[in-house]
A protein has these predicted regions:
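Phospho-regulated scaffold assembly regions enriched in serine/threonine/proline and acidic residues
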Residues: 1-80
Length: 80
């Protein structure tokens, strides 16, 4: 059984579990297939502030080497 990451479009929305790759990363293409227009991910820290997730080589990398049981939220480009 693979590992999954809980992602929601925004706070208060129902999260969707997205499959992680074998190396523990999440592909940008996997995220945008479920949430078109998404350009990034963010999550709330213990201090209740948002923190962005690192995107490198079209893969999101887990913060501090683990995704944990946190719900991550989509980041969309600002209006043009």
């Amino acid at each position: 059984m693979g590992c999954y990451l809980k992602v929601a479009e925004d706070e208060g929305e129902e999260p969707i579990e997205l499959p992680l790759e074998e190396d523990g990363t999440l592909l940008l293409s996997t995220l945008t297939a479920q949430f078109p227009g998404t350009s990034g991910l963010k999550f709330r820290t213990e201090s209740n502030t948002f923190r962005g997730v690192r995107l490198a080589d079209v893969k999101f990398h887990p913060p501090e080497d683990t995704w944990g049981d946190t719900v991550y939220y989509c980041v969309f480009l600002k209006g043009e």
